[in-house]
Amino acid sequence: MIFGYARVSTAEQKLETQIELLKQQGCEKIYTDIASGVREDRKGLNEMLSFLREGDMVIVYKTDRIFRSLKNMIELIEFFNQKGVFFKSIS
């Protein structure tokens, strides 16, 4: 399955552009969060991670939408690798 993940930092920002781009990439299910990237309690991201299975793909608009830091990027990429999940950033 192809999953998308979109995040904005504040309610004033719009998710629609990211969601539209993810749909154009073939995302079947898109998870979203409205929260600062430094927060760890991103419910949409955590829910998506719990559903991932081998062969799935995660697509984001930009890497800063999913990764909070270099350390977090390494941890999530390792998680994807262990699960056999592919990762793609549109930009």
Where do the protein language model's features map onto the residues?
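Short, structured surface patches at the beginning of a domain
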Residues: 1-91
